[in-house]
Amino acid sequence: MSLKKFNLLLLLTAFLTPAYSESLSPLKNDHVYSVYSGTFDTIDKENDAKTSFYGIQHSNTNLFKETILGKFSPVTGGFLSGKNGIYLYTGVQAEYDLGPLSIVPSFTPGYYERGEGKELGSPLEFKSEIKIDLDILKNSKIGFSYSHISNNDWGNINPGINNK
């Protein structure tokens, strides 16, 4: 699938899914979809894998669990890199609200397929991420995140990648 077709599909999914689900159900929409893009392998010393990536993430507000350590919820998502690498994941995130600002750390094990991109040493990879979100409208946020993906030395090699 070409990157232009993927971007179009991603935009249509992001904009039509909430409208379609709200028209079918009078209940509150408890599903949160995040669409994101960034730079894949930002600290690429060999200059062979740095590229863009585009992804989508889902969480359900009904599954938030309040604890003394914060508000936790499961997340599921995936991204496609500009070199046809994919990462599909599911894991947990915490959310700490500071007024209109949210700090959201997460940990998500997942499946990585390199495509024409960087070899990470194993199909099983772990993503740790810190995200800062700012509420800009009633149902919209804008944010910045930084993530690291590696296999914890369980693979043949473990170069890891950093994304922002």
Predicted features by range, described:
Residues Y20-F64, G78-L80, N163:
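Short glycine/proline- and aromatic-enriched beta-strand/turn motifs that initiate or cap beta-hairpins
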Residues M1-K28:
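Cleavable N-terminal export/targeting peptides
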Residues V32-I43, L69-S81, V104-E113, Y146-S150:
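Transmembrane beta-strand segments that form the barrel wall of outer-membrane beta-barrel proteins
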Residues L24-N29, D44, D135-K164:
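Predominantly the C-terminal beta-signal and adjacent terminal strand-loop region
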Residues Y20-D30, T61-F72, D97-I103, N139:
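Short loop/turn motifs that connect adjacent beta-strands in outer-membrane beta-barrel proteins
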Residues Y54-N60, T90-Y96, F107-P109, I130-I136:
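Residues on the lipid-exposed face of transmembrane beta-strands in outer-membrane beta-barrel proteins
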Residues S52-I56, F72, I86-V92, F126-I130, ...:
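Hydrophobic, lipid-facing positions within transmembrane beta-strands of outer-membrane proteins
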Residues T42-S52, G78-Y89, G117-P123, W154-I161:
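Solvent-exposed loop/turn segments connecting transmembrane beta-strands
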